[in-house]
Regions:
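Structured, active/binding-site neighborhoods that engage oxygen-rich ligands
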Residues: 1-481
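Short secondary-structure junctions
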Residues: 423-427, 512-518, 574-579
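N-terminal beta-strand motif that seeds the catalytic metal site of vicinal oxygen chelate
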Residues: 480-502, 552-554, 604-605
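Vicinal oxygen chelate
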Residues: 481-486, 565-605
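Amphipathic alpha-helical segments
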Residues: 499-514
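Short amphipathic alpha-helices within nucleic acid-binding modules
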Residues: 503-506, 562-567
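Conserved short beta-strand elements that form part of the metal-binding/catalytic scaffold
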Residues: 514-548, 597-603
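Short acidic/glycine-enriched loop/turn segments that link adjacent beta-strands
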Residues: 519, 550, 582-586
Length: 605
């Protein structure tokens, strides 16, 4: 290992350091997210291949046991770590009102587009959405909150350090870090870990000249009195300390001091690991820190120590550092890699990231956010929040608007930003009753947001073919509605069958239909396409247990899906499955007046 710093830190501007920290965190997040066990990756690609090739597309299982479905994550896309860094950064643009904007706007809105969010942060954000302080909620919620000691705080506080990069004192930054942290986490492990990490990032932003080997760890250890105190938050959230005492008695400050001692012990282990020089001891040190221990690996203190260690260890070879973090299988890889990337970027700027700096999701937007924070004159000290507190009704209105929208439609997102619908994703369901759809929205500022809706499919809605589905088609409508001309290129009826072998024999041998095409999962006989009920299990059902999966679907291939969609909407026919893209085809499904499913398809390449 090369222990010399290969970068001349004197030549790196503060803006470049800020952009490097933001992008380094995002790149580490995107590299590490597929590797963490909690991501529930199901495509089982080879990790070594990914490590050498950089970003790759992957598939995760989402929805838990009740709404299971698969979700495709595109190469370079980031998770909640980067989302929450950006939430913090946007809040800081509101000057002294940043904390109120964070709890009233950013956290409640985040509940609608979060990807991979941690339990404590999601619970707290839902409480803010309901207008409740997590530390003032019902007893059960309050206890959960004060037991939350994970890394969800440390992962998002880097913007505070960048905004205060030229400050000569860490005190105000420390206060803001804890004020940010208590919005979601109440245990000292979350807050002390965030303070130690924040101090390391602050040191990295301020560092110029030659960086000594292991210097960052040494500074965090030697300056413990500058970052380890529990700040007074009375002027920000006056009820917090009272709740902390109510739940923990007078012991909260004792727990805090024990946690500081724990943090120092972890950092001492890191310092010891640095003494091994060129020897490859990363796995050994990360193991000693607890990074692979299921019960503590997500702790704020453990993650802070791991990221400070890896950033110190690889200061001379920074990209190797986030790869080491991102592919430490069994650890909380996305957060460790993101936090490691934040420190390394604060030291070395952007250059070390290579093409990853351009290929990570929303790269230009991320750079712009760092640039905005660096231009302090653009911050309005008492800027009024863009809108009042976000409530559930705001988010419900957003969903209603999305369900009515078409690709390309523009409207205001819940946080006041203008967004455009850029894609509609129909997720692969892993159960017969789960329907999962996501809208990809692109904000005018450049951020990509995925908003998902999960629902239950009601078989009775389709199975009752004897009941006409209500469509607003009066005699006048039929006679006078002007509809666009539809050019049909092909047509078939899709039959879901219980036994492919028997059905093929019947249609091919008994009825004489020629098999024109076939694959592992379907057989096309003329204009009839046979599809198995369950291509994996090939389950068989009695006639008494038929479900909606047994219905036939009329498939019509057209030149322009948009024309047909417009006609269907104009006459008020029901859209059963919204427009989605799969394997080069665009398609949606509507219902005819008698409840028959009609799938409209357009080949797009």
């Amino acid at each position: 290992m090369n222990n010399d710093n290969r970068y001349n830190l004197n030549r790196i501007s503060l803006i470049a350091k800020g952009q490097g920290a933001f992008l380094g965190a995002a790149v580490g997040d995107a590299l590490g997210w597929p590797q963490e066990p909690e991501a529930k990756r199901v495509d089982n690609k080879n990790a070594a291949t990914e490590s050498s090739n950089g970003f790759q597309q992957w598939v995760r299982k989402s929805g838990g046991q009740y709404y299971p479905h698969e979700e495709v994550i595109l190469a370079g896309e980031y998770s909640d770590d980067t989302q929450l860094i950006l939430c913090t950064a946007r809040s800081l643009l509101h000057g002294e009102k940043w904390w109120h904007y964070f709890i009233k706007n950013e956290l409640p809105t985040w509940t609608r587009y979060e990807r991979g969010g941690g339990g404590a942060t999601k619970r707290a954000a839902q409480l803010w959405l309901a207008g409740q302080e997590p530390w003032s909620s019902i007893e059960k919620n309050k206890k959960q909150y004060f037991n939350a000691g994970g890394n969800g705080v440390a992962m998002r506080i880097m913007p505070h350090c960048f905004l205060g990069a030229t400050d000569t004192n860490f005190g105000n930054i420390a206060k803001n870090i804890v004020a940010n942290g208590v919005c979601t986490h109440g245990h000292p492990r979350a807050l002390v870990g965030a303070l130690a990490y924040g101090f390391a990032v602050w040191v990295a932003f301020q560092k110029t000249g030659t960086l000594k080997y292991g210097e960052i760890i040494e500074q965090v250890l030697s300056a413990v009195n500058l970052w380890s105190k529990l700040p007074n938050l009375e002027n920000i959230c006056p009820s917090w300390r009272r709740s902390a005492i109510e739940v923990n008695g007078e012991k909260y400050e004792d727990i805090w001091q024990k946690t500081v001692t724990e943090m120092l012990e972890l950092l001492a282990q890191c310092q010891e690991g640095m003494k091994h020089g060129a020897l490859s001891v990363e796995k050994e040190i990360l193991t000693k820190l607890g990074c692979f221990n299921q019960s503590i690996k997500g702790s704020g203190t453990v993650t802070a120590a791991a990221s400070i260690f890896l950033a110190s260890r690889y200061a001379a070879d920074p990209f190797h550092g986030i790869v080491e973090a991102g592919f430490a299988r069994g650890a909380d890889t996305d957060t460790v890699a993101s936090m490691t990337g934040g420190i390394l970027g604060a030291l070395a700027g952007i250059e070390w990231l290579g093409n990853h700096a351009e290929q990570v999701q929303d790269a230009r937007y991320i750079m712009n956010m760092a640039e905005l924070l660096s231009s302090k004159e653009t911050l309005v000290k008492d800027k009024i929040c863009a809108r009042t507190k976000i409530t559930k009704s705001h988010l419900d209105s957003l969903m209603a608007q999305l369900e009515m929208s078409k690709l390309g439609d523009k409207f205001l997102f819940s946080d006041g930003r203008e967004v455009q619908t850029s894609a509609l994703l129909n997720h692969q369901s892993l159960s017969k009753t789960t329907v999962a759809v996501s809208w990809k929205l692109t904000a005018t500022d450049g951020q990509s947001l995925y908003v998902k809706k999960i629902s239950r499919f009601n078989p009775e809605k389709i199975i009752k073919t004897n009941e006409a589905i209500h469509i607003n088609l009066s005699t006048k409508t039929i006679g006078e509605t002007e509809l666009q001309k539809v050019n049909v290129t092909n047509m078939a009826v899709k039959l879901r069958v219980r036994d492919m072998e028997k059905s093929r024999f019947f249609y091919e041998r008994v009825l004489g239909l020629r098999v024109e095409k076939e694959s592992n999962y379907w057989v096309k006989c003329g204009n009839i396409v046979l599809v198995p009920l369950d291509p994996v299990k090939k389950q068989r059902f009695s006639s008494e247990s038929l479900t909606s999966d047994m219905i036939q679907t009329i498939c019509i291939e057209v030149e322009s899906l948009e024309v047909v969609y417009s006609n269907v909407c104009q006459v008020g026919a029901e859209i059963f499955k919204p427009t989605s893209e799969k394997q080069g085809w665009l398609h949606f499904t509507c219902l005819d007046p008698d409840g028959n499913a009609v799938e409209i398809d357009q080949l797009i390449f």
